[in-house]
């Protein structure tokens, strides 16, 4: 599928009622990242924007300026440190400068692209799974297709070390809607009244409160082959 077809296929299962056009300045993004980004990701930002599918954060490219701290630029250093720490995905010779994050969450999974060449729309997805060995796996699909196949269980097995979205379609909520709900005393994801309102200082509840990933201690690397799904 091309990028437009992939985002349309994703919209067939993942409602965008609580999404919003991120209105990204793609020229500024390319200047910050030294690369353009795949078309399906750009389409996702136009339809859904940055936010969460349940516990899976889809990162906007740049900081939002509204207190929601997750962004691709904020996660690059930690994501690449994980790649270096494990020596990358088994069977992949590319260095850490060739991986770029786009998602995070679901019990410490980190998602990104392996920048394999100039054809951005052919970049496969790489995933770091905290509870798997080897930690890194490679999937021969783009970001939008990955999300769709995760929620429709179309991989041979769950590509994450967390089953919360495996074969189950979550709810997407844009980061601005999450913040609005939080300050209104509502649960940022469900919109239901939050019984804990007023007990804590009101910081954005669903946004990750870190600028970079927390890199865990190194573990012995397995010699298993790359886990790939086609």
Segments from the language model and where they lie:
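Compact, glycine/acidic-enriched structural inserts
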Residues: 127-157
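Extended, acidic-biased charged interface segments
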Residues: 146-177
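Helix-boundary capping/turn motifs
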Residues: 18-19, 118-121
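A short local loop/turn or secondary-structure capping micro-motif enriched for an aromatic residue
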Residues: 120-122, 134-135
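Low-complexity, glycine/alanine/valine/leucine- and proline-rich hydrophobic stretches
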Residues: 114-119, 127-129
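A short secondary-structure junction signal
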Residues: 110-115, 124, 137-139
